[in-house]
Amino acid sequence: MAEQKSSYGYEELLACGRGEMFGPGNAQLPLPPMLMIHRITEISETGGAFDKGYIRAEYDVRPDDWYFPCHFQGNPIMPGCLGLDGMWQLTGFFLGWLGEPGRGMALSTGEVKFKGMVRPHTKLLEYGIDFKRVMRGRLVLGTADGCLKADGELIYQATDLRVGLSKEGSAQ
C-alpha cells in the first residue's frame, strides 16, 4: 500500500484509478471521464462533523467538460448523479486509504438534496465528506454524510452515503 498522506494530487488519483495505490484487488477510483475529483486537499482519520474522519476534495469545472453538450443541448448542466458519484468515489477512497482490503462499490444513500446546479461558468466544486462510522466485518462498510459546493455555494447534500469494500468479486 502507498504511504498514507494527508492530501493527493491529480496524478496520484490517476494512479489510484489504475490500481497502483492500494494494491491489486483493492479500492481504486474510476479513470476519466468518470473521475469526479482533481485533488484531495485534506484527509484525516479523526475530526469532521462526527469525529470519525473526513475527506475534502476539489474538481475544476471546464466549459468543455464532456457532459455539458449532451445534458442538455441548449441548457448545459452537469448531471447531479455525477456529483453524487464523486461523493461515493471519495467515500471508497477513504476506506482504501485506511488500509482496508477489497474492491469498492457504492451501496446506497439516505437522502439527497439538490439545491443548485453546475453550469459551464462554474469554476470550482468542493466536496466535503464526514464519516459517521466504518464497520469492519466480511464487508468493510463506510457510512458518511457529504456535501458539494459550487464556487462556494452549497448545492448538493447527501446523508448516509454507504460504500462497501469486498474481497469477493475482486479480480485476481
From Swiss-Prot:
Ordered alphabetically, the record's keywords are:
Cytoplasm, Fatty acid biosynthesis, Fatty acid metabolism, Isomerase, Lipid biosynthesis, Lipid metabolism, Lyase
Give GO BP annotations, semicolon-separated.
unsaturated fatty acid biosynthetic process
One matching Pfam family is: FabA
Q: Which InterPro entries does its entry note?
A: FabA, FabA_FabZ, HotDog_dom_sf
**Reactions catalysed, as given in the entry:** a (3R)-hydroxyacyl-[ACP] = a (2E)-enoyl-[ACP] + H2O; (3R)-hydroxydecanoyl-[ACP] = (2E)-decenoyl-[ACP] + H2O; (2E)-decenoyl-[ACP] = (3Z)-decenoyl-[ACP]
Q: What Enzyme Commission number does this protein have?
A: 4.2.1.59, 5.3.3.14
Classification via CDD domains: FabA (cd01287)
Q: Where is the active site?
A: H71
Where is this protein localized, as stated in its record?
Cytoplasm
Entry similarity comment: Belongs to the thioester dehydratase family. FabA subfamily.
Q: How is this protein organized at the quaternary level?
A: Homodimer.
- NCBIfam families to which the protein is assigned, alphabetical: fabA (TIGR01749), PRK05174.1 (NF003509)
The record ties this protein, via PANTHER family, to: 3-HYDROXYACYL-[ACYL-CARRIER-PROTEIN] DEHYDRATASE, 3-HYDROXYDECANOYL-[ACYL-CARRIER-PROTEIN] DEHYDRATASE
Name of the protein: 3-hydroxydecanoyl-[acyl-carrier-protein] dehydratase
Task: Specify the taxonomic lineage.
Answer: Bacteria, Pseudomonadati, Pseudomonadota, Alphaproteobacteria, Hyphomicrobiales
| Annotated gene | fabA
